[in-house]
Regions:
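Acidic, glycine-rich two-metal-ion catalytic cores of nucleic acid-processing enzymes
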Residues: 225-226, 230-331
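N-terminal leader/targeting and assembly helices and adjacent pre-domain segments
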Residues: 1-223, 319-346
Protein backbone atom coordinates (compact mmCIF):
# COMPACT_ATOMS: atom_id res chain seq x y z
CA UNK A 1 0.00 0.00 0.00
CA UNK A 2 1.42 3.35 -1.05
CA UNK A 3 2.16 5.80 1.76
CA UNK A 4 1.23 9.46 1.45
CA UNK A 5 4.29 11.67 1.47
CA UNK A 6 4.44 14.55 3.92
CA UNK A 7 4.20 17.86 2.04
CA UNK A 8 4.70 21.21 3.71
CA UNK A 9 1.14 22.45 3.13
CA UNK A 10 -0.46 19.20 4.38
CA UNK A 11 -1.56 18.51 7.94
CA UNK A 12 0.67 16.05 9.81
CA UNK A 13 0.54 12.76 7.86
CA UNK A 14 0.60 9.52 9.92
CA UNK A 15 3.86 7.59 9.68
CA UNK A 16 1.91 4.33 9.78
CA UNK A 17 -1.46 3.71 8.15
CA UNK A 18 -2.22 1.17 10.89
CA UNK A 19 -1.40 3.65 13.66
CA UNK A 20 -2.55 7.08 12.47
CA UNK A 21 -2.30 8.68 15.93
CA UNK A 22 1.25 7.33 16.36
CA UNK A 23 0.36 5.92 19.77
CA UNK A 24 1.65 2.36 19.28
CA UNK A 25 4.65 2.90 21.57
CA UNK A 26 2.53 4.60 24.23
CA UNK A 27 -0.05 1.81 24.08
CA UNK A 28 2.65 -0.84 24.40
CA UNK A 29 4.17 0.82 27.46
CA UNK A 30 0.74 0.99 29.09
CA UNK A 31 0.03 -2.66 28.27
CA UNK A 32 3.38 -3.77 29.72
CA UNK A 33 2.68 -1.88 32.94
CA UNK A 34 -0.82 -3.35 33.22
CA UNK A 35 0.53 -6.86 32.61
CA UNK A 36 3.03 -6.48 35.46
CA UNK A 37 0.31 -5.31 37.82
CA UNK A 38 -2.07 -8.13 36.90
CA UNK A 39 0.71 -10.69 37.29
CA UNK A 40 1.18 -9.42 40.84
CA UNK A 41 -2.58 -9.62 41.40
CA UNK A 42 -2.66 -13.20 40.13
CA UNK A 43 0.31 -14.19 42.31
CA UNK A 44 -1.25 -12.67 45.42
CA UNK A 45 -4.62 -14.31 44.72
CA UNK A 46 -2.91 -17.66 44.23
CA UNK A 47 -1.30 -17.29 47.65
CA UNK A 48 -4.64 -16.26 49.18
CA UNK A 49 -6.26 -19.44 47.86
CA UNK A 50 -3.35 -21.55 49.10
CA UNK A 51 -3.73 -20.00 52.55
CA UNK A 52 -7.24 -21.50 52.74
CA UNK A 53 -5.63 -24.94 52.89
CA UNK A 54 -5.18 -24.55 56.63
CA UNK A 55 -8.96 -24.26 57.00
CA UNK A 56 -9.63 -27.25 54.75
CA UNK A 57 -10.49 -30.81 55.59
CA UNK A 58 -11.56 -33.73 53.43
CA UNK A 59 -15.23 -34.52 53.79
CA UNK A 60 -15.88 -37.59 55.93
CA UNK A 61 -17.32 -39.47 52.98
CA UNK A 62 -16.29 -38.67 49.46
CA UNK A 63 -19.14 -38.36 47.03
CA UNK A 64 -19.33 -40.85 44.20
CA UNK A 65 -20.52 -39.56 40.86
CA UNK A 66 -21.61 -42.02 38.18
CA UNK A 67 -22.10 -41.03 34.58
CA UNK A 68 -22.30 -42.79 31.27
CA UNK A 69 -21.07 -41.25 28.01
CA UNK A 70 -23.60 -41.78 25.24
CA UNK A 71 -23.18 -42.18 21.50
CA UNK A 72 -25.04 -40.09 18.93
CA UNK A 73 -28.06 -42.40 19.23
CA UNK A 74 -28.25 -41.98 22.96
CA UNK A 75 -26.92 -45.48 23.68
CA UNK A 76 -24.56 -46.02 26.59
CA UNK A 77 -20.96 -46.67 25.49
CA UNK A 78 -19.62 -48.03 28.79
CA UNK A 79 -19.74 -47.21 32.45
CA UNK A 80 -17.28 -44.75 33.93
CA UNK A 81 -17.04 -44.18 37.64
CA UNK A 82 -15.66 -40.87 38.82
CA UNK A 83 -14.41 -40.75 42.39
CA UNK A 84 -13.95 -37.11 43.33
CA UNK A 85 -12.74 -35.73 46.64
CA UNK A 86 -14.86 -33.05 48.23
CA UNK A 87 -13.66 -30.71 50.93
CA UNK A 88 -15.19 -28.61 53.62
CA UNK A 89 -13.72 -25.34 54.85
CA UNK A 90 -14.00 -23.72 58.22
CA UNK A 91 -14.98 -20.17 57.32
CA UNK A 92 -16.45 -17.70 59.76
CA UNK A 93 -17.96 -14.30 59.10
CA UNK A 94 -14.68 -12.78 60.25
CA UNK A 95 -12.73 -14.97 57.84
CA UNK A 96 -15.06 -14.02 54.99
CA UNK A 97 -14.62 -10.31 55.79
CA UNK A 98 -10.85 -10.81 55.93
CA UNK A 99 -10.85 -12.34 52.43
CA UNK A 100 -12.90 -9.44 51.04
CA UNK A 101 -10.66 -6.91 52.74
CA UNK A 102 -7.52 -8.54 51.33
CA UNK A 103 -8.90 -8.55 47.77
CA UNK A 104 -10.05 -4.93 48.00
CA UNK A 105 -6.68 -3.79 49.36
CA UNK A 106 -4.83 -5.73 46.65
CA UNK A 107 -6.87 -4.37 43.73
CA UNK A 108 -7.06 -0.80 44.99
CA UNK A 109 -3.31 -0.76 45.57
CA UNK A 110 -2.37 -2.22 42.17
CA UNK A 111 -4.93 -0.58 39.87
CA UNK A 112 -5.88 2.64 41.66
CA UNK A 113 -2.83 3.24 43.87
CA UNK A 114 -5.34 4.41 46.45
CA UNK A 115 -6.88 2.63 49.41
CA UNK A 116 -9.69 5.19 49.64
CA UNK A 117 -10.87 4.92 46.04
CA UNK A 118 -9.90 8.54 45.37
CA UNK A 119 -7.58 9.40 42.49
CA UNK A 120 -4.05 10.09 43.76
CA UNK A 121 -2.11 13.04 42.35
CA UNK A 122 0.43 10.80 40.62
CA UNK A 123 -1.76 7.89 39.52
CA UNK A 124 0.43 5.63 37.34
CA UNK A 125 -1.92 5.71 34.34
CA UNK A 126 -1.87 9.50 34.04
CA UNK A 127 1.51 9.44 32.27
CA UNK A 128 0.10 7.49 29.31
CA UNK A 129 -2.95 9.73 29.03
CA UNK A 130 -0.91 12.93 29.26
CA UNK A 131 1.53 11.63 26.65
CA UNK A 132 -1.31 11.02 24.19
CA UNK A 133 -2.96 14.35 25.02
CA UNK A 134 0.23 16.37 24.57
CA UNK A 135 1.10 14.52 21.34
CA UNK A 136 -2.26 15.59 19.95
CA UNK A 137 -1.72 19.23 20.92
CA UNK A 138 1.65 19.26 19.15
CA UNK A 139 0.29 17.50 16.06
CA UNK A 140 -2.68 19.86 15.87
CA UNK A 141 -0.52 22.97 16.12
CA UNK A 142 1.94 21.62 13.56
CA UNK A 143 -0.88 20.72 11.16
CA UNK A 144 -2.35 24.21 11.55
CA UNK A 145 1.04 25.79 10.85
CA UNK A 146 1.58 23.60 7.79
CA UNK A 147 -1.73 24.68 6.26
CA UNK A 148 -1.61 28.39 7.14
CA UNK A 149 0.17 29.64 4.04
CA UNK A 150 0.03 33.45 3.76
CA UNK A 151 -1.03 33.20 0.11
CA UNK A 152 -4.12 31.25 1.24
CA UNK A 153 -5.15 32.53 4.68
CA UNK A 154 -3.51 35.95 4.59
CA UNK A 155 -0.49 37.38 6.39
CA UNK A 156 -2.27 38.22 9.65
CA UNK A 157 -3.72 34.76 10.24
CA UNK A 158 -0.50 33.08 9.10
CA UNK A 159 1.45 35.12 11.64
CA UNK A 160 -0.99 34.27 14.46
CA UNK A 161 -0.79 30.57 13.63
CA UNK A 162 3.01 30.67 13.57
CA UNK A 163 2.98 32.06 17.10
CA UNK A 164 1.13 29.03 18.50
CA UNK A 165 3.28 27.17 21.01
CA UNK A 166 2.51 23.63 22.15
CA UNK A 167 4.60 24.10 25.30
CA UNK A 168 2.95 27.33 26.43
CA UNK A 169 0.96 27.07 29.66
CA UNK A 170 -2.75 26.84 28.90
CA UNK A 171 -5.18 26.58 31.84
CA UNK A 172 -7.93 25.29 29.54
CA UNK A 173 -5.76 22.35 28.52
CA UNK A 174 -4.77 21.66 32.12
CA UNK A 175 -8.44 21.53 33.14
CA UNK A 176 -9.38 19.40 30.14
CA UNK A 177 -6.61 16.90 30.88
CA UNK A 178 -7.71 16.72 34.52
CA UNK A 179 -11.20 15.79 33.33
CA UNK A 180 -9.70 13.03 31.17
CA UNK A 181 -7.80 11.71 34.21
CA UNK A 182 -10.97 11.68 36.31
CA UNK A 183 -13.08 9.95 33.68
CA UNK A 184 -10.53 7.18 33.07
CA UNK A 185 -9.89 6.74 36.80
CA UNK A 186 -13.62 6.26 37.35
CA UNK A 187 -13.68 3.65 34.59
CA UNK A 188 -10.77 1.81 36.17
CA UNK A 189 -12.44 2.06 39.57
CA UNK A 190 -15.57 0.49 38.09
CA UNK A 191 -13.44 -2.37 36.78
CA UNK A 192 -11.69 -2.70 40.16
CA UNK A 193 -14.95 -2.87 42.12
CA UNK A 194 -16.37 -5.40 39.66
CA UNK A 195 -13.25 -7.56 39.97
CA UNK A 196 -13.39 -7.34 43.76
CA UNK A 197 -16.87 -8.88 43.80
CA UNK A 198 -16.02 -11.40 41.07
CA UNK A 199 -12.84 -12.71 42.71
CA UNK A 200 -14.42 -12.88 46.16
CA UNK A 201 -17.43 -14.79 44.86
CA UNK A 202 -15.26 -17.17 42.82
CA UNK A 203 -13.12 -18.02 45.84
CA UNK A 204 -15.88 -18.37 48.41
CA UNK A 205 -18.21 -20.21 46.02
CA UNK A 206 -15.44 -22.70 45.28
CA UNK A 207 -14.96 -23.29 49.00
CA UNK A 208 -18.70 -23.63 49.59
CA UNK A 209 -18.90 -26.15 46.72
CA UNK A 210 -16.17 -28.26 48.27
CA UNK A 211 -13.63 -27.77 45.49
CA UNK A 212 -9.95 -28.45 46.00
CA UNK A 213 -7.28 -25.77 46.20
CA UNK A 214 -6.03 -26.48 42.67
CA UNK A 215 -9.50 -26.12 41.13
CA UNK A 216 -10.24 -22.92 43.02
CA UNK A 217 -6.85 -21.50 41.98
CA UNK A 218 -7.62 -22.23 38.32
CA UNK A 219 -11.05 -20.60 38.54
CA UNK A 220 -9.64 -17.50 40.24
CA UNK A 221 -6.85 -17.21 37.65
CA UNK A 222 -9.46 -17.26 34.87
CA UNK A 223 -11.32 -14.38 36.50
CA UNK A 224 -8.10 -12.38 36.87
CA UNK A 225 -7.56 -12.98 33.13
CA UNK A 226 -11.02 -11.60 32.37
CA UNK A 227 -10.19 -8.49 34.39
CA UNK A 228 -6.92 -8.07 32.51
CA UNK A 229 -8.73 -8.23 29.16
CA UNK A 230 -11.13 -5.54 30.32
CA UNK A 231 -8.25 -3.37 31.55
CA UNK A 232 -6.51 -3.72 28.18
CA UNK A 233 -9.67 -2.62 26.40
CA UNK A 234 -10.00 0.42 28.66
CA UNK A 235 -6.34 1.22 28.02
CA UNK A 236 -6.60 1.10 24.22
CA UNK A 237 -9.88 2.98 24.19
CA UNK A 238 -8.91 5.77 26.56
CA UNK A 239 -5.39 6.51 25.33
CA UNK A 240 -6.70 7.03 21.80
CA UNK A 241 -9.71 8.84 23.23
CA UNK A 242 -7.40 11.26 25.03
CA UNK A 243 -5.54 11.93 21.78
CA UNK A 244 -8.71 12.59 19.79
CA UNK A 245 -10.26 14.74 22.53
CA UNK A 246 -7.16 16.94 22.75
CA UNK A 247 -7.02 17.32 18.97
CA UNK A 248 -10.65 18.44 18.77
CA UNK A 249 -10.30 20.80 21.74
CA UNK A 250 -7.22 22.48 20.27
CA UNK A 251 -8.75 22.71 16.79
CA UNK A 252 -11.89 24.26 18.25
CA UNK A 253 -9.81 26.79 20.18
CA UNK A 254 -7.82 27.76 17.06
CA UNK A 255 -11.06 28.21 15.12
CA UNK A 256 -12.51 30.47 17.82
CA UNK A 257 -9.35 32.50 18.47
CA UNK A 258 -7.96 32.84 14.95
CA UNK A 259 -10.35 31.74 12.20
CA UNK A 260 -13.61 33.16 13.62
CA UNK A 261 -13.81 36.08 11.14
CA UNK A 262 -12.03 34.29 8.33
CA UNK A 263 -13.47 32.75 5.14
CA UNK A 264 -11.77 29.54 6.30
CA UNK A 265 -12.34 27.11 9.15
CA UNK A 266 -10.63 23.95 10.28
CA UNK A 267 -12.74 20.81 10.19
CA UNK A 268 -11.86 17.16 10.85
CA UNK A 269 -10.05 14.96 8.33
CA UNK A 270 -10.53 11.29 9.18
CA UNK A 271 -7.49 9.01 9.20
CA UNK A 272 -8.72 5.44 9.57
CA UNK A 273 -6.49 2.75 11.01
CA UNK A 274 -6.00 0.64 7.90
CA UNK A 275 -5.56 -2.63 9.79
CA UNK A 276 -7.21 -6.04 9.63
CA UNK A 277 -8.85 -5.50 13.03
CA UNK A 278 -10.53 -2.24 11.97
CA UNK A 279 -14.30 -2.23 11.59
CA UNK A 280 -15.46 -1.70 7.98
CA UNK A 281 -17.57 1.36 8.80
CA UNK A 282 -14.52 2.95 10.46
CA UNK A 283 -12.34 2.24 7.40
CA UNK A 284 -15.02 3.77 5.17
CA UNK A 285 -14.43 7.16 6.79
CA UNK A 286 -10.78 7.39 5.67
CA UNK A 287 -10.27 10.61 3.71
CA UNK A 288 -13.69 12.03 4.61
CA UNK A 289 -14.22 15.46 6.19
CA UNK A 290 -16.51 15.96 9.18
CA UNK A 291 -17.48 18.65 11.65
CA UNK A 292 -16.29 18.16 15.22
CA UNK A 293 -19.88 17.59 16.31
CA UNK A 294 -20.25 14.76 13.78
CA UNK A 295 -17.08 13.11 15.07
CA UNK A 296 -18.23 13.42 18.68
CA UNK A 297 -21.65 11.98 17.85
CA UNK A 298 -20.05 9.02 16.07
CA UNK A 299 -17.91 8.15 19.08
CA UNK A 300 -20.84 8.48 21.48
CA UNK A 301 -22.84 5.77 19.69
CA UNK A 302 -22.79 1.96 19.43
CA UNK A 303 -19.46 1.45 21.16
CA UNK A 304 -17.62 3.10 18.26
CA UNK A 305 -14.93 4.46 20.58
CA UNK A 306 -14.05 1.02 22.00
CA UNK A 307 -10.65 -0.18 20.72
CA UNK A 308 -10.77 2.40 17.89
CA UNK A 309 -7.31 3.35 16.58
CA UNK A 310 -8.56 5.95 14.07
CA UNK A 311 -7.55 9.57 14.45
CA UNK A 312 -8.58 12.90 13.03
CA UNK A 313 -6.57 15.93 12.03
CA UNK A 314 -7.55 19.55 11.38
CA UNK A 315 -8.13 20.24 7.70
CA UNK A 316 -8.53 23.75 6.29
CA UNK A 317 -11.78 24.19 4.37
CA UNK A 318 -13.64 27.05 2.73
CA UNK A 319 -16.31 28.14 5.20
CA UNK A 320 -18.95 28.74 2.49
CA UNK A 321 -18.39 25.78 0.19
CA UNK A 322 -17.06 23.27 2.72
CA UNK A 323 -14.36 22.24 0.23
CA UNK A 324 -10.89 21.38 1.46
CA UNK A 325 -8.05 23.65 0.41
CA UNK A 326 -5.83 20.55 -0.14
CA UNK A 327 -8.03 18.63 -2.57
CA UNK A 328 -5.12 16.52 -3.79
CA UNK A 329 -4.58 15.14 -0.27
CA UNK A 330 -8.20 14.02 -0.04
CA UNK A 331 -7.87 12.30 -3.42
CA UNK A 332 -4.68 10.51 -2.35
CA UNK A 333 -6.26 9.31 0.89
CA UNK A 334 -9.26 7.85 -0.91
CA UNK A 335 -6.97 6.12 -3.38
CA UNK A 336 -5.00 4.76 -0.41
CA UNK A 337 -8.23 3.41 1.12
CA UNK A 338 -9.30 1.75 -2.15
CA UNK A 339 -5.86 0.15 -2.56
CA UNK A 340 -5.94 -1.19 1.00
CA UNK A 341 -9.44 -2.61 0.56
CA UNK A 342 -8.43 -4.30 -2.69
CA UNK A 343 -5.38 -5.79 -1.01
CA UNK A 344 -7.30 -7.35 1.87
CA UNK A 345 -10.49 -8.17 -0.01
CA UNK A 346 -12.74 -5.84 1.97
Amino acid sequence: MKKIRQIKSYPVIPRSAEDPANQKGNLKRAQVELKKRFERINKAMKQLVKDQEQYQRVASANKMAFWWPLDSNGERINEVVVNKAYYSYDISTERYDSINSFIEHLLYNELLESLTGQRPNNWFYQSYLSSAYNDAIRDTIQSSKNMAEPSVVGDEIAMMIRQLDADAFNPQQVNALSLVYSRVFNEMKGLTDSMKVDLSETLTRGMASGLGIREITQDVAKRVGVGFSRAQRISRTEILGAYRTAQRDKTRQINEDIYSDSPFVQKQLWFSALAMTSRPHHVAKHGQIYSMQEVEEFYSENGNSINCLCSQSPILVNRKTGEAVMKDLIKKMRQQKDAWRAGVGR
